């Protein structure tokens, strides 16, 4: 039973683990969608409620598994209690039997004691009779004492045997009583343990009831959360419909704004043409007056040649206007040059910071172009945190080709900032989930507003530049229009500076996070390099030790081979010596046998 409970407890957490994995995957997908399309507070609230629901469901599952385990343990304890109660009943029955046996034995002991007392009294009476008999024998002639004492001694022996048997029975009964007392003590202990287990079971039942109440409360909370979720879903649907309507209205307003701006541009072009025509008329009048004066003065003498005062005043006024216009143009050009130089310096500094931040992690540099491609292939609505779509909508008649380089640099910086943001999301998670999405939604809104303002400012600058080009050909402007232009340019520069400062702050934060991530990666790489160096040192030491051992083994093998060769040489020498000895022995024996035979033949010859 306990093994089954443990298996249930071990298998139960697998479901929540899978749910956690799915929750993390869904959260990552929601964060990616929030990054691409912006985040709404309603969506954030919905995700939070869904997370709470999942947590409650997980807690419910855990509580149910605990309840099942407790129920199984309760059943096991109930079975154990039932078994203990059965054993207790059996022990009580045995106790009753032993008590009845003890009572019967006690009665028998009392009877034996009474019989013993009676036997002692009979013994005393017999002794008294013996004394009387002895006294009577002295007086009278009586039968022999042995005849009287024999039956009495036989009775005494029988009584003593019965007394010994009764004493043995008493000892056995004492042993049985001691055993029963020990069994009673064990039974009392088991009863106490059973009572403690029963108390534990009662406590567990109380805990189960509390858990059931908590489960009911959780069910009610889940129902309330379901209702709230349904309400939030309905509100989200309504809000999504209103958002769609507002988007359609914004699109319509953008189209109308584009049309209005086209008309304004056309009117401005017509006004510029009118001003150029007026300038050309003034120049034509001046030239005509000069020609008329020249023609009129041809027939006069050199002393009589005079220019009329009106013509001289008109020419003077015309030249003063052109000089003032040129001065205003010089001032505007100086201002634009200064602002462009400042912007150039700022952009160069920011590009250096970006390059320093992007050069650090090689993985980040390899990921950036792929992400840029995905952004360029995808919808260009939030390419620069919500403002690129409005930029593309504001130029339906081919105005994208006429934009200034500052706008191009701004759009490239915004796209690079979005890429850096996305890369920083993958490398360093330095912000929390909910606050990050809310901050990003705020940043998207502000960035879109500021970039829309910057696009309007760029278009105003373009119209001003075109107007200046036409004025270089010969337009005359008043000082009020010049002051208005300077005010517009300062406002546009301020808006551009606001956008650049906003992007600079964002990029600076991302650069700091990237530098931190790079520093952490460098530290991890250094640690890995140190570990690799340590392993390489260990490998070198092991290889050296292996080489030393191999050299030792080779030396030992060479020594063994030398010893074996020496042993072989010794054996060969011994074999050769034995062979030589055997060959010498055979030769000497042959010589001796030959000499013996010759001597014998000589002796025989001499004998003959």
Curated annotation (Swiss-Prot):
The coiled-coil regions, if any, are 40-346, 542-576
MF-aspect GO terms: microtubule binding
The terms describing its cellular component in GO are: cytoplasm; microtubule
Q: Please indicate if the UniProt record lists RNA-binding as a keyword.
A: no
Q: Where is the composition biased (Polar residues)?
A: 363-379, 476-493
Q: Region labeled Required for targeting to microtubules — which residues?
A: 224-458
What InterPro entries would the database entry show?
MAP70 (IPR009768)
Major location category of this protein: cytoplasm
Gene Ontology biological-process entries: cytoskeleton organization
Where does the record say this protein resides?
Cytoplasm, Cytoskeleton
Its biological purpose = Plant-specific protein that interact with microtubules.
User: Family assignment?
Assistant: Belongs to the MAP70 family.
What name does this protein carry?
Microtubule-associated protein 70-3
The source organism is Oryza sativa subsp. japonica
């Amino acid at each position: 039973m306990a093994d089954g409970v443990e298996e249930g407890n071990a298998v139960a957490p697998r479901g929540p683990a899978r749910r956690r994995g799915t929750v993390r995957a869904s959260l990552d997908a929601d964060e990616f969608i929030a990054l691409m399309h912006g985040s709404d507070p309603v969506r954030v609230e919905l995700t939070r409620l869904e997370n709470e629901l999942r947590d409650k469901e997980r807690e419910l599952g855990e509580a149910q598994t605990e309840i099942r385990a407790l129920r199984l343990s309760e059943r096991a304890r109930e079975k154990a209690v039932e078994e203990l109660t059965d054993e207790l009943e059996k022990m009580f029955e045995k106790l009753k039997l032993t008590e009845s046996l003890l009572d019967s034995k006690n009665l028998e002991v009392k009877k034996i004691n009474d019989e013993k007392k009676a036997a002692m009294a009979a013994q005393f009476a017999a002794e008294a009779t013996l004394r009387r008999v002895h006294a009577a024998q002295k007086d009278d002639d009586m039968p022999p004492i042995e005849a009287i004492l024999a039956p009495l001694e036989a009775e005494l022996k029988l009584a003593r045997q019965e007394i010994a048997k009764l004493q043995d029975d008493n000892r056995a009964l004492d042993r049985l009583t001691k055993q029963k007392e020990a069994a009673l003590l064990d039974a009392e202990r088991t009863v106490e343990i059973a009572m403690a287990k029963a108390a534990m079971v009662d406590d567990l039942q109380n805990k189960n009831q509390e858990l059931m109440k908590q489960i009911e409360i959780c069910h009610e909370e889940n129902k309330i959360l379901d209702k709230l979720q349904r309400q939030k879903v309905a509100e989200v649907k309504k809000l999504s419909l209103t958002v769609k309507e507002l988007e359609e209205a914004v699109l319509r307003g953008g189209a109308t704004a584009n049309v209005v701006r086209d008309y304004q541009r056309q009117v401005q072009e017509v006004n510029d043409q009118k001003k150029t025509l007026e300038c050309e008329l003034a120049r034509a009048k001046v030239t005509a007056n000069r020609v008329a004066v020249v023609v009129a003065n041809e027939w006069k003498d050199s002393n009589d040649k005079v220019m009329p005062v009106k013509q001289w005043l008109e020419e003077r006024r015309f030249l003063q206007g052109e000089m003032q216009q040129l001065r205003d143009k010089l001032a505007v050009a100086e201002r634009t040059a200064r602002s462009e130089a400042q912007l150039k310096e700022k952009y160069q500094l920011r590009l250096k910071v970006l390059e320093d931040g992007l050069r650090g992690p090689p993985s980040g540099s390899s990921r950036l172009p792929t992400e840029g491609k995905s952004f360029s292939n995808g919808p260009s609505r939030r390419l620069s945190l919500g403002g690129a779509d409005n930029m593309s909508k504001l130029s339906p008649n081919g105005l994208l080709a006429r934009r200034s380089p500052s706008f191009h640099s701004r759009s490239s910086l915004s796209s690079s900032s979005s890429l850096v943001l996305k890369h920083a999301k993958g490398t360093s998670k330095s912000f929390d989930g909910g606050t990050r999405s809310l901050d990003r939604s705020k940043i998207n809104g502000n960035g879109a507003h500021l970039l829309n303002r910057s696009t309007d400012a760029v278009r105003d600058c373009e119209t001003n530049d075109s107007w200046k080009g036409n004025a270089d050909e010969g337009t005359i402007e008043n000082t009020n229009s010049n002051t208005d232009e300077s005010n517009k340019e300062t406002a546009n520069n301020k808006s551009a500076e606001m956008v650049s400062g906003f992007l600079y702050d964002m990029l600076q934060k991302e650069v700091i996070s990237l530098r931190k991530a790079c520093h952490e990666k460098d530290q991890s790489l250094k640690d890995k390099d140190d570990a690799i160096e340590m392993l390489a040192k260990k490998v070198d030491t092991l290889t050296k030790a292996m080489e030393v051992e191999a050299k030792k083994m080779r030396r030992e093998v060479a020594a063994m081979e030398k010893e074996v060769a020496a042993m072989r040489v010794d054996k060969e020498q011994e074999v050769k010596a034995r062979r030589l000895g055997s060959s010498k022995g055979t030769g000497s024996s042959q010589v001796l046998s030959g000499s013996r035979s010759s001597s014998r033949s000589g002796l025989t010859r001499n004998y003959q």
